[in-house]
């Protein structure tokens, strides 16, 4: 995967689990030198194009364990989720495991309990805290360019105080979010970053990006729902 030759996916979320991964129903039963996996995962990024899936399942003692499952293994099936109105650039899938047999060596030896997958999510959320700023910057750029070129009553709408207020809010939110993510990065390098710091940064920056996208769509008017601009992709 590091060389870009293999695609992987992270199988944690379940149809009835959502934000409660500890309630997962996917299970792994030891059978000699193998494990047999059964269950379903949902909203898995790259699921149907992956070569290998990291599947989280409960063993017979109820402990959450991680298993590396090649996607061509008998009993493994990935169904693409179509007809999405959002996240259209991201492949989402349902994973179905029906008596999927993997060797005991597929078990991640040091991953034990709910903290194992959650530690992975902390790293992902750190990236999202930064990525949301890119979305915010994109919708701001679209809104600024459009407001300068679009005129009403013989005046660019960028000169209207209401539009200016929306643009200033976007700049302020982006600046605040950038400082937050930058400080979080320093704490990460220092080893003082905690999972709650990451969760708050992700929450605040994603909230700011969504707010900016809604404001940008209002500034663009009807053009805001077209794919001529990137605003609607970030709603």
Where are the regions a protein language model picked out?
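Glycine-rich, charged/polar anion/phosphate-binding loops
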Residues: 11, 24, 40-42, 54, ...
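Glycine-rich phosphate/pyrophosphate-binding beta-alpha loops
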Residues: 17-18, 42-48, 86, 123-127
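A short core secondary-structure module
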Residues: 34, 40-78
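Cytochrome P450 core scaffold surrounding the K-helix E-X-X-R motif
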Residues: 19, 105-111
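Flexible, small-/acidic-enriched active-site or ligand-binding loops
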Residues: 23, 72-101
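Active-site-adjacent elements of ketosynthase-type condensing enzymes
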Residues: 16-25
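Alpha-helical interface subdomain recognition
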Residues: 4, 30-35, 94-96, 110, ...
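A short, Trp-centered hydrophobic/proline-enriched beta-strand micro-motif
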Residues: 4-13
């Amino acid at each position: 995967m590091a060389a870009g030759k293999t695609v992987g996916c992270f199988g944690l979320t379940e149809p009835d689990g959502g934000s409660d991964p500890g309630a997962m129903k996917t299970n792994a039963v030891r059978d000699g030198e193998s494990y047999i996996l059964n269950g379903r995962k949902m909203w898995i990024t790259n699921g149907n194009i992956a070569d290998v899936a990291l599947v989280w399942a409960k063993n017979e003692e109820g402990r959450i364990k991680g298993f590396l499952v090649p996607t061509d293994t008998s009993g493994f099936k990935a169904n693409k989720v179509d007809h999405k109105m959002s996240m259209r650039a991201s492949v989402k899938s349902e994973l179905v495991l029906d008596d999927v047999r993997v060797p005991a060596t597929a078990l991640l030896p040091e991953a034990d309990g709910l903290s194992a997958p959650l530690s992975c999510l902390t790293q992902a959320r750190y990236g999202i805290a930064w990525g949301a700023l890119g979305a915010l910057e994109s919708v701001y750029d679209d809104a600024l360019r459009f407001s300068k070129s679009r005129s009403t009553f013989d005046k660019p709408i960028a000169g209207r105080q209401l539009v200016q207020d929306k643009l200033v809010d976007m700049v302020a939110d982006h600046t605040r979010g950038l400082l937050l993510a930058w400080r979080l990065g320093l704490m990460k390098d220092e080893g003082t970053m905690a999972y709650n710091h990451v969760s708050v940064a992700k929450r605040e920056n994603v909230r700011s990006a969504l707010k900016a996208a809604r404001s940008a769509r209002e500034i663009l008017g009807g053009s805001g729902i077209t794919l001529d601009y990137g605003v609607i992709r970030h709603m």
